Amino acid sequence: MESTLFLSKPLPTTIKTTTHSLSSVYPNPFKPNNLTFPRTTHKHPTTTTITAAISRTKKEETVETVQKHLENCYLLAAINYKGFTVKQFQDLRKALPENTTLIVAKNTLVEKAVQDTQWAAIKPCMKGMNAWLFVHSEEIPIAIKPYRTFQKERKLEDNDFTGACFEGKFYGPGEVKRLETMPSKAEIFAKLLGSLKSPGSALVGTLQAPARDLVFLLKAYIKKLEDEQQQG
């Protein structure tokens, strides 16, 4: 007996299968194209910014240094140091007396330091390359002489004083020599004593005057001698 199988639908001759990859069904959450991160930009100080800050600090320190040296200062002078070697500058510092200070600073910074002070009279020197000499002594000629000696020995004729400020007054290059020839306090008092000892001196009659008047007169006489020496 033959048996026959009847189907409601004929069997397909070819069975198609569809293969789905795991990644298409379950996307990888760690795959870059499926995960977006916000971009974070970190700003760091640039070299230019750091350099500018350091430069500004140094400028402020220079101004403060100049102002400090101006305390108890009797004379501020500018010297043209163009062409100076490092060794020459070091030797010059050693040659100067202890009551003087020599520094190199930009004209603009020195000008800022002397602003609204009696030293503002030095402003005509604010050009060229200057080294600044601070004299912390009333004996101006004695303080300046070592530089003149150094200048002559090293044949630095071009490195002369470009100006100076003394008692709020500016002295140009040709007038600085007047400061170099001022009499010292010892010389002034010697002249004063000589005048007092002179029988015909008008000061002899003032010895009986009150002490306050005598002191005032002595100061006026000293000032007169200084002015005469400068004019001479």
Curated annotation (Swiss-Prot):
Gene3D superfamilies: 3.30.70.1730, 6.10.250.290. It comes from the Eukaryota. It holds the Pfam family Ribosomal_L10. Coiled coil: none annotated. The keyword Plastid applies. The keyword rRNA-binding applies. Keywords: Chloroplast, Plastid, Ribonucleoprotein, Ribosomal protein, RNA-binding, rRNA-binding, Transit peptide. Its main location: plastid. GO terms for cellular component: chloroplast; large ribosomal subunit. Transmembrane segments: none annotated. This is Large ribosomal subunit protein uL10c. It comes from Spinacia oleracea (Spinach). The gene is RPL10.
